[in-house]
Amino acid sequence: MNTMALYLIGDIQGCDNALQRLLEKISFSPSRDTLYLLGDLVNRGPDPLAVLRRLMRLGASAHCLLGNHDLHLLAVAHGVRPAHQHDTLDGILQSADRPSLLAWLCQQRLAIFDNFRGEDILMVHAGVLPAWTATQTVALAGEVEAILRGPDLADFLHHMYGNEPSAWDGSLHGIDRLRVIVNALTRLRFCTPDGRMEFKHHGGVETAPPGYLPWFDAPGRRTADVTVAFGHWSRLGWLEHPHLLALDTGCVWGGHLSAIRLDDSVPNRPHHLIQVQCEACQTPEI
């Protein structure tokens, strides 16, 4: 008899065929197994509508994080942002079940922290600021999640975008506070050693601007004692370091859609990586 399995999956970005093939490869059973998805469920891939419908049908078997593309969908749907040239969101926006899909999306998380067979894992889409603990990260994510599920959603989306403030300060309040939280959890790649973020550079770790470094290399990072799992950074690719799992392997760019099984891991041994090849749907930006 097969036992329950827990899987962590990287950025799907609307590639439903790849998701279906990955679920078949792991013999996923929604009545038995559980998925944790690291955000960017939609956009740029050919069928984000099918992705949302599939994940929504899975109910409690799928725990989804929100990425920057998922928040972009909400902003476009509420008339806050124009669609971008390479967006593939029309199917969702024109679907009869648009209201239920968007309502479901607003119920998803920005951070998850749990223990899997003795391993504490913090899941985010993009990154964590060095001053934040895992527990604090989940609490701060909860502040944004409450807004996404409340009556002030549209107003929040109108003010969510922007690069400032670029650093965390516990005294921040209002939209400045919420914007820093969103930017860290859904957009962060590089920061200064003391946690000042920048968003112009999207390449690999070697493209860090002077004075900046990958967020996970910040000295004194307070989540260094837990495993942080994240997506978002396709130029980074699959990365497994002590207490670090990067799972955006560029599915939409013709890379792979990746999963690891969490419940069969052995402490201090590599996780087993499971992948399916993806068809390129977009050309990577240079």
Question: Where are the regions that the model predicts?
Answer:
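Residue-level marker for buried hydrophobic side chains located in beta-strands
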Residues: L8, L37, C64-L65, L122, ...
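N-terminal active-site segment of His-dependent metallophosphoesterases
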Residues: M1-L58, L71
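Acidic, His/Gly-rich catalytic cores of divalent-metal-dependent hydrolytic chemistry
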Residues: V138-I286
